[in-house]
């Protein structure tokens, strides 16, 4: 499955005003001294265009047969309505609480017959698109004031990774962590410590490890990890940065089972090829 076609983000000046408002709020509340006073939204799926702000990845990009889809699912009887424009070409919709994105498809281990250099398939994923620039420069997430990445998710019984891309000297580096849930098939709020992510490149853990560049986060995404043929489904309502440990209905407490390991720990499971290269 190729990348989702994206509509434009907010207009340049609208984005710049939003960023100016955020920076002003930090100064007024002295958050640069006292620390963040509340959570910071990273991405939510309350509008139809929210899924267009994401990119699909799978082994189909290298000739494999796995499929990947990202659908917007509103609550029953909800009708999207268009609000006033912000100067961009996209249609801005009124947010609908309770909406979510459904990432689903089928994993296939079949190798492409016309590309002998491809020796491994069986993966799929998606990530948020890189944020467009503002008058203040490149669009980046500064999550340094926060301890946790929080997410509202519902998974099947399969295994997934959470993947974080940052501005880096090595563009193909990813910071990864297992998405560990207690109740597959039910909605849960999961918290992962930013410091628990492990840096990888082309599916291998990088040694020595270096800390995530938390002031310059480019995108956040999810990927399958188990390489088992068959259907998969992961639903995501929203992602945000927080310092509030109590926000989680299920917190990532089983660190031994959830984290990647370095060369001094147990075996490491990672994603494959193309997901690192996009």
Curated annotation (Swiss-Prot):
- Pfam families, A to Z: CIA30
Q: Does the record carry Mitochondrion as a key word? A: yes
Where does the transit peptide start and end?
1-8
One GO MF term: unfolded protein binding
* Keywords assigned: Chaperone, Mitochondrion, Transit peptide
Mitochondrion found in the keyword field = yes
Q: Where in the cell is it found?
A: Mitochondrion
Q: Name one GO cellular component term.
A: mitochondrion
Q: What processes in GO biological process is this protein linked to?
A: mitochondrial electron transport, NADH to ubiquinone; NADH dehydrogenase complex assembly; protein-containing complex assembly
InterPro entries annotated for this entry?
Galactose-bd-like_sf (IPR008979), NADH-UbQ_OxRdtase-assoc_prot30 (IPR013857), NDUFAF1 (IPR039131)
Q: Which family does the UniProt entry place this protein in?
A: Belongs to the CIA30 family.
Q: What does this protein do?
A: Chaperone protein involved in the assembly of the mitochondrial NADH:ubiquinone oxidoreductase complex (complex I).
The record's listing under PANTHER family reads: COMPLEX I INTERMEDIATE-ASSOCIATED PROTEIN 30 (PTHR13194), COMPLEX I INTERMEDIATE-ASSOCIATED PROTEIN 30, MITOCHONDRIAL (PTHR13194:SF18)
Protein known as: Complex I intermediate-associated protein 30, mitochondrial
């Amino acid at each position: 499955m190729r990348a989702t076609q994206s509509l434009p983000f907010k207009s340049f000046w609208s984005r710049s005003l939003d960023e100016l408002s955020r920076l002003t709020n930090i100064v007024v509340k002295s958050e640069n001294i006292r620390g963040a006073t509340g959570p910071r939204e990273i991405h939510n799926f309350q509008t139809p265009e929210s899924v267009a702000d994401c990119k699909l990845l799978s082994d189909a990009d290298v000739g494999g047969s796995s499929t990947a889809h990202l659908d917007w699912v509103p609550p029953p009887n909800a009708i999207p309505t268009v609000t006033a424009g912000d100067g961009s070409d996209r249609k801005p919709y009124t947010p609908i609480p309770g909406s979510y994105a459904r990432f689903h498809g089928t994993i296939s281990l079949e190798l492409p017959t016309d590309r002998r250099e491809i020796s491994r398939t069986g993966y799929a994923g998606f990530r948020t698109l890189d944020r467009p620039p503002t008058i203040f420069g490149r669009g980046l997430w500064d999550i340094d004031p926060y301890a946790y990445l929080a997410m509202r998710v519902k998974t099947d019984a399969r295994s997934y990774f959470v993947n974080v891309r940052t501005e880096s000297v090595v563009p193909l580096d990813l910071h990864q962590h297992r998405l560990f849930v207690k109740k597959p098939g039910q909605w849960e709020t999961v918290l992962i410590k930013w410091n628990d992510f492990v840096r990888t490149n082309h599916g291998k853990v990088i040694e020595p490890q270096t800390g995530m560049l938390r002031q310059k986060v480019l995108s956040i995404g999810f990927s399958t990890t188990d390489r088992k043929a068959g259907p998969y489904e992961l639903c995501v309502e929203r992602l945000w940065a927080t310092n509030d440990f109590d926000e989680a209905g299920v917190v990532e407490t089983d660190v031994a089972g959830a984290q990647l390991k370095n060369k001094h720990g147990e075996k490491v499971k990672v994603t494959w090829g193309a997901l690192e290269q996009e």
